[in-house]
C-alpha cells in the first residue's frame, strides 16, 4: 500500500520539534549561535531520539537547540514556511502547527511579533503549495499562570487570522487542569478552540479533568485513558478526538512497541482517533512513516485509514470551507 500518495491531515505537530537540521546549522552559522557540533551527523544526536530516551522529560530535552535558532522574526517565518513545505511534500493537505510563543522572546521579540512571523511563514507556503495551515498557541505548564494568561490575551487578536486554538503543553503532572480553569475560561470567551495535552505520561485522570474542567474539545495524545475507565467512557460518549502520535509515544516509553500501543483498540471501539507526528525531527518521522508502521505492525488497512482521515477532517479546527475541501480528497483514498 502506497501511503505516500494518500491525502493526509496533521493536527498535532510542534514547530520547534520539526525543524530541518540543515536549517539549524545554517541559522546558527549566520547568527553566531553556539552549537555542540556543526557536523550534521553529530548534531542529529542532539535534536533527534536515537533509542536512548527513557521518559517524556528526556524527550523534551531535544527542544533546547532548536529553540536557540527560533528567536528572530526572519527565522520563525522561515522555519514555519519550511515545515509546511516539508509536509506538503508528504501530501499533507491541512496542518495545525502548534508552538509556545514565550519560548521565542530571548532576543526581545514580543508575543505579537512572534505569532505574526509564524503566520507569515504559513501563509507564504499556502500560496506555493497545495496545503492549508492554522496555528495553535501553546501555554507552557512549566511556566507560571500569569504567562498563560499573557499568551491567551495577546494571541486573541489573531483569532480568525490563522490562530485557531489554545493548548497546554510541556511535562505532565497529575491533576494539572485544576490550575488552569480561569485561563481556559478566558480563552473560550476570546473565541479560541481548546485542545489539551493530557494522558500522555501515565495519568488518564488528566483527560477526564481536561474535558470537565477546561472544556477541552480535543486531547493531545490521551493514550492513558486505557487505564482510567471514567475518562475512556467520557471520551467515547462525547466523541472527543484524540491526537495520537504513536512513534512519539514509543520514544517517551509510554509503550514498548507499536503492537502494544492501544491505538487500534481505540479505533475499533469507535474512539475518534487521529494519527499525527508530534515532532517530525525529534521523532524522525512523517505521517507517511506513522501509517507505514501502523500498517506493518498493527494491520492498518485502507478502510481504517479512510476512517482516520475523516476523523481528522471533523476534529480539525478548520473553517467549514476548508473542511469541505478536505472531504473532497476522500475519493483518493484507495488501496
From Swiss-Prot:
Catalytic activity, as annotated: adenosine + H2O + H(+) = inosine + NH4(+); 2'-deoxyadenosine + H2O + H(+) = 2'-deoxyinosine + NH4(+)
Domain of life: Bacteria
Residues that bind substrate: 14, 16
Sites annotated Important for catalytic activity: 221
NCBIfam families: aden_deam
Stated family: Belongs to the metallo-dependent hydrolases superfamily. Adenosine and AMP deaminases family. Adenosine deaminase subfamily.
Protein's name in the database: Adenosine deaminase
Natural source organism: Clostridium botulinum (strain Langeland / NCTC 10281 / Type F)
